[in-house]
UniProtKB/Swiss-Prot annotation:
The gene is ku. Disulfide bonds: none annotated. The lineage of its organism: Bacteria, Bacillati, Bacillota, Clostridia, Eubacteriales. This is Non-homologous end joining protein Ku. It holds the Pfam family Ku. GO terms for molecular function: double-stranded DNA binding. It comes from Heliobacterium modesticaldum (strain ATCC 51547 / Ice1).
Length: 276
């Protein structure tokens, strides 16, 4: 599969200039449905209409406007927006370096891969190796599609990844949520049991293990319908009742985990006997 870059520019690192290309690191895998007319099954079309002129408008007739008062707009052109972009807008300007643990994941939005061009490989390797050695990530600013973005550069695999980030004012406060259990007293025994349950479920992260079960069910369902097969409904998940005794629930959960781990370990022991 041909991978195409979505942006070309450079990383500015002190007096070092690193020409790079930007590539999307993620892609959506959701099952997409088309909206069809129920009677004839043809796709629904959406038209851009002006309610005042009562007619459809073309893309050339559409402009951007900011509503500064109810029903009142100031028109902003694309040229004006581009004129507001700072000089060096094709540059990822590194401002500082921080430890990854200092940034909460809530700040990260989207991930991209950074690839050096032929003349920037040595400088790229230098930055990557320095970030790896210091266990740091770089905070930078860049203009993407006329919009200034706060980004973080870090080592990922053999290269560098760039995460777009939210600004602090874009993250909502938790204060309006009220009391989040801070006034509730938890006994030392309950705390110990909860920690024990967490420890028993702790394991190395294996990304392959985490697949979208719902997406697979939808795909199987669609394939069955396309092939004219009988549709089998999924069994209903038992409704979980209200937990009355927290300690009993924790004990039962720990026992359930132990039982499951024994079942998973049994086939491995059986295989060892056969190979010995």
């Amino acid at each position: 599969m041909i991978v195409r870059s979505i942006w070309k520019g450079a990383i500015s690192f002190g007096l070092v200039h690193i020409p790079i290309k930007l590539f999307a690191a993620t892609e959506e895998k959701d099952v997409r449905f088309h909206l069809l007319h129920k009677e004839c099954h043809n796709p629904i079309q959406y038209q851009k209409r002006c309610p005042y002129c009562d007619r459809e408008v073309t893309p050339e007739e559409i402009v951007k406007g900011f509503e500064y008062d109810k029903g009142r707009y100031v028109i902003i052109t694309q040229e004006e927006l581009e004129g507001l972009a700072p000089e060096g807008s094709r540059s990822i300007d590194i401002q500082s370096f921080v430890a990854l643990k200092e940034i909460d994941p809530i700040f990260f939005v989207k991930t991209y891969y950074l690839s050096p061009d032929q003349h920037g490989q040595k400088a790229y390797a230098l930055l990557r190796n320095a970030l790896r050695e210091t266990d740091r990530l770089a905070l930078a600013r860049v203009i993407l599609r006329t919009k200034e973005a706060l980004v973080a550069l870090r080592v990922y695999g053999k290269g560098l990844a760039m995460h777009t980030m939210l600004y602090p004012e874009e993250i909502r406060s938790m204060e309006p949520l009220g009391d989040l259990g801070e006034s509730i007293e938890v006994s030392a025994k309950e705390q110990t049991m909860a920690v024990q349950l967490i420890e028993s479920l702790t394991e190395p992260f294996d990304p392959v293990k985490w697949q979208s079960e719902q997406r697979e069910r939808i795909r199987h369902f669609i394939n069955a319908k396309v092939q004219g097969q009988a549709i089998v409904e999924a069994p209903q998940t038992p409704t979980v009742g209200k937990v009355i005794d927290l300690m009993e629930a924790l004990k039962a959960s720990i026992q359930q985990v132990k039982t499951q781990q024994k079942k998973e370990a049994a086939p491995k022991k059986e295989r060892r006997r056969k190979t010995s």
